[in-house]
Amino acid sequence: MSRFIISSHSPNEEGNVVRVTPESAGWEYVGFEVYALTKGQTLRKETIDQEACLVLLKGKANIHTRHERWENIGLRMDVFEKIPPYSVYVPSNDVYEVQALTDLELAVCLAPGKGTYPARLIPPSEVGVEMRGAGNIERRIHNILPESKPADSLLVVEVFTPEGNWSSYPPHKHDQHNLPHESYLEETYYHQINPDHGFMVQRVYTDDRSIDETMVVKNGDVVLVPKGYHPVSAPPGYEGYYLNVMAGPVRTWKFRNDPDHEWVMESKLAAKQK
């Protein structure tokens, strides 16, 4: 298996099914966890020196922090309903407690925090929805925690790729601290597939090909993108979902397309406008 794939496993005692830490990934900023909680199960964590974005992938919950309480939040029961999710932002040096009111799949997105902003609910109405691309590179975007919304480090977005389409395309990268042209951001992809016995294909490669891996990705896999371009393809018959977490030294998303393939977007958009 590729060193960039972290596969999920059966839930442990606290419900964790996958965990990525900066130490395990060999980088500095991004952490990511998923919990599969049964109805009535409670998860309690301290954020310490990290901020967190709790994304209710499916199911309903009560979520409490040190100073806030949100009761009976959650709307979708499957990510492929394509309804924007409920999420909760939790600053560093705080505590969160999640009580599952139904079976619950919870993503915990982590990055260094400074405690600048208070805990807050991110309801579906505050999630920006857009269609990006055109033709067979069109995909649906839910901007959960974009750079226009307050946080110290985290950027969080989910993407739906129709069957037979590509996303994160044209291939782009953000691995150089070269503002305003490009920002350095580590990134994780948490994949789900409908139907769940299918697969996605993701390539991670650099200009010099010191990294060049094409991976078959299963439902529940996390793909690490430490650097390089990272396009995704959904085979016919299977639609893809992924949750992206990004963080780096500066909280801005500035990317560079692979110049060999940048023409594709221009061509697709021109065809769409005809």
From Swiss-Prot:
InterPro entries: Deoxy-glucuronate_isom_IolB, IolB_Bacilli, KduI/IolB_isomerase, RmlC-like_jellyroll, RmlC_Cupin_sf. Its EC number is 5.3.1.30. It catalyses: 5-deoxy-D-glucuronate = 5-dehydro-2-deoxy-D-gluconate. Keywords: Isomerase. The keyword Isomerase applies. Involved in the isomerization of 5-deoxy-glucuronate (5DG) to 5-dehydro-2-deoxy-D-gluconate (DKG or 2-deoxy-5-keto-D-gluconate). PANTHER family: 5-DEOXY-GLUCURONATE ISOMERASE (PTHR39193:SF1). This is 5-deoxy-glucuronate isomerase. The gene is iolB.
